């Protein structure tokens, strides 16, 4: 059985993960989603700390990692926001970062909430 995913999470990405574990015997999707949740907590804290210290290279590192991991689980808006921040930091366009970082903070909450029913759903 498959729950209808939230529009926050791309179904095709989830299906690619499911396809790697036919029948769900290895609980791959659940494990990947739990690992994502754990990394989000760590990366979110790093992002808050880097932002408070105005450490743009640490911001860039955190969003780079978050960009890839969020894309892998289908959180495409979050991934795009992270890519936008990463590109801005790369060219030192810092003026527009505060609202983008706020968007990432909000989207992290939305993504984590969307993952809860997916993480515990049967394969």
Label for each model-derived stretch:
Residues 1-123:
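Two-component system phosphorelay core
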């Amino acid at each position: 059985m498959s729950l209808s995913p939230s529009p926050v999470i791309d179904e095709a990405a989830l299906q690619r993960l499911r396809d790697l574990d036919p029948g769900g015997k290895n609980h791959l999707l659940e494990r990947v989603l739990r690992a994502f949740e754990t990394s989000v907590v760590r990366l979110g804290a790093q992002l808050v700390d880097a932002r408070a210290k105005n450490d743009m290279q640490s911001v860039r590192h955190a969003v780079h990692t978050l960009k890839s991991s969020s894309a892998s689980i289908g959180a495409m808006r979050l991934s795009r926001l992270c890519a936008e921040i990463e590109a801005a930091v790369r060219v030192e366009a810092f003026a527009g970062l505060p609202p983008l970082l706020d968007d990432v903070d909000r989207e992290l909450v939305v993504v984590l909430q969307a993952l809860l029913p997916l993480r515990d759903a049967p394969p």
